[in-house]
A protein has these predicted regions:
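Hot-dog-fold acyl-thioester-processing enzymes
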Residues: 1-40, 94-106
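A broad, structure-centric signal for solvent-exposed, well-ordered loop/edge residues
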Residues: 14, 19, 25, 53-55, ...
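A conserved acidic, glycine/proline-rich C-terminal tail/linker
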Residues: 34-71
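HotDog/MaoC-like acyl-thioester-processing domains
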Residues: 52-54, 63-106
Length: 106
C-alpha cells in the first residue's frame, strides 16, 4: 500500500521541520484497516535520514516482511528516502462485554 502526504504546519516542529511524531503518524496511515481493527502496535523502530519541510510531498510505501512486520518507507519528491520505520503488531486482548462486567459487579 502507498499514499502521498503533503507536509502542513500541523506536521512541523519548532525548527519548521516535519516532526518525528508526524513521520510515525504518516507511516501508520498506510496500515490496512483489518490490522488496525484487530491488532495493537507492539513496537516501532524508526530511522530518520533526511529533513522534510513545509509543503514538501512525501510518498509513503508499506510492505509486509517475511517475519510479519511492516516496513514503511517515506521518500521525498526527488526519490530520496527520508525515513524508514519497522512496525510490529500483536492481537488485541479480548475485551469482555460491558454487560458481563456490570453483572459481575452486582
Amino acid at each position: 500500500m502507498q499514499m502521498e502526504h503533503r507536509a502542513t504546519r500541523l506536521d512541523l516542529d519548532f525548527n519548521f521541520h516535519v516532526s518525528n511524531r508526524s513521520y510515525v503518524s504518516i507511516a501508520l496511515l498506510t496500515m490496512p484497516d483489518e490490522v488496525l481493527a484487530k491488532q495493537t502496535l507492539k513496537t516501532v523502530t524508526v530511522h530518520w535520514l533526511h529533513e522534510t519541510y513545509l509543503d514538501e510531498t512525501l510518498l509513503c510505501r508499506m510492505s509486509r516482511t517475511e517475519d510479519g512486520s511492516y516496513l514503511h518507507t517515506l521518500t521525498n519528491a526527488d526519490g530520496v528516502v527520508v525515513c524508514e520505520l519497522m512496525s510490529q503488531w500483536q492481537p488485541q486482548p479480548e475485551t469482555p462485554d460491558v454487560s458481563e462486567v456490570l453483572n459481575r459487579s452486582l
